Amino acid sequence: MVLAALIAGMASTAGMAAAADEPAPTFSEAITQSAHRAEWKRMISGETRVPGWLASENRVSSPYRREQIEGASYLVGWMCKPHDCAANQFYGVIDEDAHRMWGMLVTLPETPGAYDAPSKYASFRWFGKPDERMKAYLRDQLKQDPNWK
């Protein structure tokens, strides 16, 4: 009996350790899941000149996280263009209940000084028609980047 409990405890601990070693799902993975794929496609299909890295699945991404914004739960995350993250970033928000998605594309020109003071050179593009509250939230996410000056 004691041996069975010990084995069960070891198996449980091993299972938790294996789960802890698995990488967290990324925002890029979240938007390709069947639950969110239609919202993502709807959001970018209404736009013109969507950057190739954003329209394809060729992007670098952070793990998504669940956040409360004014009492509602959202999935939030970040993606960027491979090998050019500093100049091409996308911050996104998924509202799972309303089946909506919003995003902010931040790009920097190839101008001397742009990487040293990105806030002076950056251009912003909104996806999904976010309201002012959501735009402010997305801007706040960008300001948390330690390289954003």
Residue ranges and their predicted role:
Residues 76-82, 104-105:
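Short beta-strand segments that buttress and anchor functional surface loops
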Residues 84-91:
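Short, surface-exposed coil-to-beta transition loops
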Residues 18-78, 146-148:
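N-terminal secretory signal peptides
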Residues 20-38, 110-149:
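C-terminal partner/receptor-binding element of secreted or periplasmic proteins
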Residues 67-70, 94-99:
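A short, structured loop/turn motif at beta-sheet edges
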Residues 2-13:
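Bacterial N-terminal signal peptides
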Residues 97-114:
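Intrinsically disordered, low-complexity regulatory segments enriched in Ser/Thr/Pro
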